[in-house]
Amino acid sequence: MFQILMENVEVQHIDRIAALLIFFTSFIGFACNTFIAFYIRRLSLLRNSFGRLLQLQAAGDAVFVLVWAFYFAPVLFFDIKPLQSLAIAARFAQLCLICYDISIYTHLVISLNRFISLYFPTSYQNIFTERFTTFLICSIIFVSFGFSWFLVIRDCQMGFSIPRWMLDYVSPPCEMINVYYAEFFRGLIVISMFAITNSFTFCRMHMHNRKKQTATVFETTQQKKRRAVETRFVQQVTMQGLLYVIELVTYFYISLRFPVPLEPVELAKSSNRWPNFLLTTYAWILVHALDGVITLIFNKQFRSVLRHPCRSQEALNISKTPSRRSRFTTNRDESNRKKSSILACTFISNSNTGYGSSVHV
């Protein structure tokens, strides 16, 4: 079935439109995520557990959209027959699955990271140590590679279907019932964990902000800035988690309402072709592209670099150097801040800036 769908189908004008949509969306996502992955370690604010997890997430997203922008989209647009062979397409499809798993598992860990820092702020640094973060990163990569190779062992390989504009499993020899339930239950677990964790996190942050509004007059400038950063970051994590939930729901459930035939002739006439593509392949690509866009929107440090690309690293981090007044204020309110700060352990760098560091928002 796959050989008919891949190699014996001529590319039409409508196929090239889909290829352009895939390319431009993937390229934007690649630019944003690559910028984040390379630049994040230069920010002292993100030299911590969260920064390392965010870097892994951005790297996975960048490689994922890179494959779509510079392999699948050109193959579809230019109808490159030599690159449509299963031996080549299956390897790139396998790489996409690995990067997708890395991204989604990293999102789960980051959501749990936010949850712990929100409900157990005093224990956060003892839990998310440098060693434990390294263990989590290695585990995410290992599990992602393991699931991909499990599919290969079960003779379940994926290739790009030109008529359907999506990745298809080669069946036979792949037993689709096994793949469906593996993907179905994994998707169900991920959706549940995303929804529950992010709901608790967002509700807790909302309650915290309402409580703080009654005591705003007693907050120092440092505490107000820090709370603003904490609020924006919870909004970022909630937004990214919500997008992944929507993508999983559309891919595994809503798209079933728009079935498409397998035969190329009937598929070309099907009115469900575009809805199925937008709910599956494009939603899959879009969520990885928007990951980087959302991170840039909610983090002023990254936007400052985009506005001033020639500005030195010292100039960008100058606001993090504590003044005499900020050190005096911090020492005076240190005990109160330890009690009231919910996510400070995430946003305050463990570098030599210390507790007096000024959060640049």
Swiss-Prot record:
Organism of this sequence: Caenorhabditis elegans
Top-rank taxon, per record: Eukaryota
Keywords: Cell membrane, G-protein coupled receptor, Glycoprotein, Membrane, Receptor, Transducer, Transmembrane, Transmembrane helix
Carbohydrate attachment residues: N317
Subcellular location: Cell membrane
Transmembrane segments: 20-40, 58-78, 92-112, 133-153, 176-196, 242-262, 278-298
Encoding gene (name): srx-45
A cellular-component GO term for this protein: plasma membrane
Entry's family note: Belongs to the G-protein coupled receptor 1 family.
Protein name in the entry: Serpentine receptor class X 45
Annotated PROSITE patterns: G_PROTEIN_RECEP_F1_2
Membrane topology: Multi-pass membrane protein
SUPFAM superfamilies the record matches: Family A G protein-coupled receptor-like
Cited InterPro entries: 7TM_GPCR_serpentine_rcpt_Srx, GPCR_Rhodpsn_7TM
Pfam families the UniProt entry points to: 7TM_GPCR_Srx
GO MF terms held by the record: G protein-coupled receptor activity
